[in-house]
Amino acid sequence: MRSPRTRGRSGRPLSLLLALLCALRAKVCGASGQFELEILSMQNVNGELQNGNCCGGARNPGDRKCTRDECDTYFKVCLKEYQSRVTAGGPCSFGSGSTPVIGGNTFNLKASRGNDRNRIVLPFSFAWPRSYTLLVEAWDSSNDTVQPDSIIEKASHSGMINPSRQWQTLKQNTGVAHFEYQIRVTCDDYYYGFGCNKFCRPRDDFFGHYACDQNGNKTCMEGWMGPECNRAICRQGCSPKHGSCKLPGDCRCQYGWQGLYCDKCIPHPGCVHGICNEPWQCLCETNWGGQLCDKDLNYCGTHQPCLNGGTCSNTGPDKYQCSCPEGYSGPNCEIAEHACLSDPCHNRGSCKETSLGFECECSPGWTGPTCSTNIDDCSPNNCSHGGTCQDLVNGFKCVCPPQWTGKTCQLDANECEAKPCVNAKSCKNLIASYYCDCLPGWMGQNCDININDCLGQCQNDASCRDLVNGYRCICPPGYAGDHCERDIDECASNPCLNGGHCQNEINRFQCLCPTGFSGNLCQLDIDYCEPNPCQNGAQCYNRASDYFCKCPEDYEGKNCSHLKDHCRTTPCEVIDSCTVAMASNDTPEGVRYISSNVCGPHGKCKSQSGGKFTCDCNKGFTGTYCHENINDCESNPCRNGGTCIDGVNSYKCICSDGWEGAYCETNINDCSQNPCHNGGTCRDLVNDFYCDCKNGWKGKTCHSRDSQCDEATCNNGGTCYDEGDAFKCMCPGGWEGTTCNIARNSSCLPNPCHNGGTCVVNGESFTCVCKEGWEGPICAQNTNDCSPHPCYNSGTCVDGDNWYRCECAPGFAGPDCRININECQSSPCAFGATCVDEINGYRCVCPPGHSGAKCQEVSGRPCITMGSVIPDGAKWDDDCNTCQCLNGRIACSKVWCGPRPCLLHKGHSECPSGQSCIPILDDQCFVHPCTGVGECRSSSLQPVKTKCTSDSYYQDNCANITFTFNKEMMSPGLTTEHICSELRNLNILKNVSAEYSIYIACEPSPSANNEIHVAISAEDIRDDGNPIKEITDKIIDLVSKRDGNSSLIAAVAEVRVQRRPLKNRTDFLVPLLSSVLTVAWICCLVTAFYWCLRKRRKPGSHTHSASEDNTTNNVREQLNQIKNPIEKHGANTVPIKDYENKNSKMSKIRTHNSEVEEDDMDKHQQKARFAKQPAYTLVDREEKPPNGTPTKHPNWTNKQDNRDLESAQSLNRMEYIV
C-alpha cells in the first residue's frame, strides 16, 4: 500500500491537468477586449471652470481674465450601459479610468497619437453589448490638499460601436471648454465578433490545423478539414468507404482492400485467373475454371502451343493436341524434318543443318541460337568523364557532358564557343569549365544576374529601384535626398497666418493658432458662437477670445443651462401652483411672475381652482408632472425580430442579423459580394446565402471538388458534415439555421431586464436599455429623483419610479410645498374686516366699530346708499371723492371732479344720463395727437369756473399755479382735462376736501405749449385755517420729493406759485439809525424768532421780504434750483430764470437721497433778502471752489446769518419754498 505522500504526488499532475483544462475552457467560453479613448485636443481659452471661477485663483484685475495661472487639465471617463436619458449617478458598470495631467488651458495632441498619457484603456471580460453610454469629464488638478479638484467641463454620449481598429472621433463643442476625443473598441488577441466573445487561436498540431479569418472563423490549412480542422483530406479518388488517411494526400486501405485508391478487393490467395467483388473471392475469368481459376478451359486459344501451322484441339482442362503439317512432328509440331526450311535465323544470320537440327551463324553485333540477341557493346562502359553510352548494332555511341567531347568523351570542350557569357568582358575556357569576366553590376556563372545595389541604401521606408551597377530611391511623401534621408520642411514657406506657430511634421505641418483663430492655416477668426453653446434660447455674443450668453430671466450659468432659483436670494410670493411672484425693476408694477417649474423641463403648468394644477406635456411625455416618456415602442414597429429602443417622441430599431432599414424591413443582400466561385449561382437567404454549384464543384462557395465542407460553411462555431451531394451543420447553443446563422434570442428569454427595460440580444449575451428612472446592468437600481431635494418649506420628499412626491408641512400645499395655504380664501372675517394670512392660520384686522376674533361684533350703525348696506367704518370711492360710513352717517370729500372723459367712437354710452360726448377743442390737447377724445358735457350746464383771478392770492382763498412739463415723458393723447383730473385724485386732497369744497380748474398756457395754469379755490372757509395754502404746499412738496407713484408728477419739470407782490419800505433805515436802543431791540426780536423757528421744525422752507439794507442787497446770492433728475438738458429744457418784478413763486425738482438729507435740510434752512425780487427759486447748484473742481452742495447752500431775519415785515411776508 502506498503512503499518503506517494498518493499526493501521483494525484498532483492530474489536478494540474484539470485546472489547466478548466482555465482553457473558461478562456474559450469567455470574452476579452478593451475600450480605448484618446484625448486629441482641448480648448479652454479663458482658463475657467464650469462654475465660472478661474482655475488659478482670482482673475486678472486689468481685463478680468483668468490669465494668472493655467488649468492643470486631466480627464475622467465613466463607461456604463446604454441610457436613453443620460444620468451622472450610478456605477460605471463597464469601467472607469483617468489620465494624468496632460496639458494646460489649450493643447493639441493629434500629432502625438499613440502616447499613453492621453489614452485611457478600459478592459472588459464580458461580451461587448455594442450599445453604451460614455461620460467624459475634464478636471483641474489642485496640488493643494485642502482645495479639492474642480470640474472644467463634461460631455456625455450614448450610441453603438462595433469592435474595429478604426477610431471614431467625437467632439464637445458646448460649455466652458471645447475638447475632442476618439474612441474605439478592440478585441484582444484570438477574440473576434461584435461581442469579442468568439475565441479562435491558430494551431498546427494534433488538435487541429487551422488559421483564423477576420471574423474569428477557423480556416483549415491545405489538406485538412472538419470543425476543428483535424481531419486530413485523403488522396483524390481515395475510396471514402474502404480507405482512410491520417496525413493529407494519403490513402490507407482497410483490411481486405488494396490499390492506389483502396477501391480493389483482395482475391482469395492462389486465385490465378479469377477476380473478386468482395475480399477473398475468386470469380474465374472466361475459359478458366477450378477453385483457384487455374484450369485453362481453352488452352489452345490461350496459349496457341502448336507451331509451324499445326492445328490445336482442346482435349480437357489444361490439355490439348497438335495435328502437325507435313514435314513437322513433335507435341507442338516443333520438330522439322528439314531444319533450315523454316529460316529460323534472324537478323540476317545464315542457317546450317546439322544432325541435331540446325545452327545459325550470326552477323556482326548479334548473338544467340537464332541471332535474336543484340550484343551489348557498352559493357564495359567505354565513355569517359560521365558520358552516357548508347548501345548500337555492332557498336556504341557516347553522349558527353557539355564540358567534354570526342568518341569516348576524353577531349575537353571549348564552352566559350557557345558564347555563354551574357554581360561579360570576355570568356575564358577552363578544363571542364569556363570563366566569364563580368561587367560592373553583373554576377553569376554567365554574368546574367544583376547585382542588387539596393541593399541598405534607402531610408525612411523609401522604395529602391535597382539599376545596372546603381540604384534609385523613390522617396515617400515628405522626404527628399539621394537616400531619402532629409525631411522636407513644410514650414519653410511660413504657411500659418495671424501669428500662428508652424510645427513641421512628416509630409505635413500643423499650425498652432493663437487665441481667437482656428483653421488649418489659422485663417479663420473663431466664432465661439458657432455652434451656439448657449441653451434655452439664449443669445450668443462672440468675443475676441470667448463668448457671452445673454440668458433669459429664468436661466443662469455660463451657457444658460441652469434653471435660476429666483427665490433663493429674493423673497417670493406664491400665487398658485404654477406661478410665483418676485420683486423686479423691469416691470412698471415692480413685480414679475415666473413659473414654479412644477411640470419639469417637459411640460407647461396650467393653474386650476383650489390650488390645483395640470401639466400640458411636450410631445413624447405624459404623466402628472410630464415625467413619463411615452413608450413609442408599444406598437412594436420593428419587424423581423428587431429590438425597439424607445426615445423621446421617437424610437430606434436594432435589427437582427440579416436585416436593415428604419423598421428592419429590408433583407440584407448577402450575395452582393459575389461569394460563389467557379460559375456558381448565388441565392440570397436571411443572413445567409446558397450557392448552386456547377461542373462538379462543391462546398459552401463552390470552391472544392473534394468536399462539401470548408471553413466558411457553418457559422458561429457550427460543425459541418459532408453528406455527399449536400452538407449539414450541427449548431452550438444559441444559434440555429442551415448554416448556424440565426440567433435564438435565448439570452433574453425570460426577459432579464427589470422595470420595463428593453433586452437587446448579442449572441449568447444581452444588454438592457433602461427606462427613465432606472439604471444598472439589469435596470434594477432606482434613480434618486429626490436629489437634489425638490421640496420647499420643510416638506418631505418621497422617491418613486421616475417621480417624486412632496409631503408638505402643516400650512403649506402644492406639488413642491411652495404654496402657503391661504386660510383667508374662505373669507372667515366679517364684512369689512381685513384677513391677514399666516402660516397654518389667519388673523382678522377689524374696521372701526367691529371687534372679535373674526370681527363679527358690530359697535356702530351701518349706512344705506344706492340700495346697499355699508357697515360702519367702511370706505369707498365715488368718482374722484372718497366716502366713509361713520355710525350711520355718510361723509364724503368735496372735490369738484370736472367733466368725465369719453371716446367719440363709442358715442354717449360712456357719459352719464343727459350728457353727450363732445369733441375737445384743439387747444385743450396737451400732448398731441388727441384723436377721438372728447368730454361728457350737457348743453344746459355751463363749465364751472373758480372765483380765482390772475391777481388772487392765499388771502383770497385762491391759488394760481403754473406747471411746466417734460412732454417726452408723457403719453400721447393727454388733454388738459386729463391732467386736471389726475390732480383732483391726488391723495393729498382727501383730508382737506373732507372739510372744504375744493375746485380745481386748468387752462393751457397761451405763451408756452408745455405749461398749464391751474387755479385752486375753496369754499366754506373758516377763520382758523387756510386750506389753499396747505394744498399748495403739499403739491409742491409732492413734486419736489417725487412722491405719489404718479407718471404725471414724474413728468413735472417746474412749478410756479403766484403770490402777492411785496412793498418797498423806504423808511426802514430811519428807525435803524435813530438810536442804538432800537437796533438792540430788533436783535433781541430776531433771536427770539430764530429760537421759535428751530423748535417748530416745519418741513417747508421759509422766505422773507428783502430788507432795505443796501449793503445786503449788493451781495446777491442765488438760491439752489431744484431740477427734475429725469429731465435732460436738451433743447426743450426750461432755463433757470430770475423772476424779478413778477408775482410768482417757483419750485424746481430736487432729489432726496435719504432721511439724513431731510434732517440736514431742516437744520440749514435760512432766509435771505433781495431787493426788488419777490419770486424765489430753489435749485440744486454746483459751485466751483477756488481750484475749479465742481462740488455738490448738500441741498441748501445759503450760508447767510439768521440774524439778518430781524425785520417784522420779513416775518409777516415769510413764504414756503420747496
From Swiss-Prot:
Record comment regarding domains: The second EGF-like domain is atypical.
Keywords, comma-separated and alphabetical: Calcium, Cell membrane, Charcot-Marie-Tooth disease, Deafness, Developmental protein, Disease variant, Disulfide bond, EGF-like domain, Glycoprotein, Membrane, Neurodegeneration, Neuropathy, Notch signaling pathway, Repeat, Signal, Transmembrane, Transmembrane helix
Protein name: Protein jagged-1
Region (Important for interaction with NOTCH1): 199-207
Domain DSL as annotated: residue spans: 185-229
Primary role: Ligand for multiple Notch receptors and involved in the mediation of Notch signaling. May be involved in cell-fate decisions during hematopoiesis. Seems to be involved in early and late stages of mammalian cardiovascular development. Inhibits myoblast differentiation. Enhances fibroblast growth factor-induced angiogenesis (in vitro).
Gene name of the record: JAG1
Effect of residue 937 to Q: In ALGS1; likely benign; the mutant is able to activate Notch signaling
Extracellular side: 34-1067
InterPro entries membership: DSL (IPR001774), EGF-like_Ca-bd_dom (IPR001881), EGF-like_CS (IPR013032), EGF-like_dom (IPR000742), EGF-type_Asp/Asn_hydroxyl_site (IPR000152), EGF_Ca-bd_CS (IPR018097), Growth_fac_rcpt_cys_sf (IPR009030), JAG1_1/2_dom (IPR056986)
Top-level taxon: Eukaryota
Disulphide connectivity of cysteines: 187-196, 200-212, 220-229, 234-245, 238-251, 253-262, 265-276, 271-282, 284-293, 300-312, 306-322, 324-333, 340-351, 345-360, 362-371, 378-389, 383-398, 400-409, 416-427, 421-436, 438-447, 454-464, 458-473, 475-484, 491-502, 496-511, 513-522, 529-540, 534-549, 551-560, 578-605, 599-615, 617-626, 633-644, 638-653, 655-664, 671-682, 676-691, 693-702, 709-720, 714-729, 731-740, 748-759, 753-768, 770-779, 786-797, 791-806, 808-817, 824-835, 829-844, 846-855
Glycosylation sites noted in the Swiss-Prot or TrEMBL record: 143, 217, 382, 559, 745, 960, 991, 1045, 1064
Tissue-specificity statement: Widely expressed in adult and fetal tissues. In cervix epithelium expressed in undifferentiated subcolumnar reserve cells and squamous metaplasia. Expression is up-regulated in cervical squamous cell carcinoma. Expressed in bone marrow cell line HS-27a which supports the long-term maintenance of immature progenitor cells.
Compositionally skewed regions (Polar residues) per UniProt: 1189-1199
Localization of this protein: Membrane; Cell membrane
Disease affiliated with this protein: Alagille syndrome 1: A form of Alagille syndrome, an autosomal dominant multisystem disorder. It is clinically defined by hepatic bile duct paucity and cholestasis in association with cardiac, skeletal, and ophthalmologic manifestations. There are characteristic facial features and less frequent clinical involvement of the renal and vascular systems.
Consequence of changing residue 908 to Q: In biliary atresia; extrahepatic
Mutation effect (residue 37 to S): In ALGS1; the mutant is unable to activate Notch signaling
Annotated phenotype, changing residue 53 to D: In biliary atresia; extrahepatic
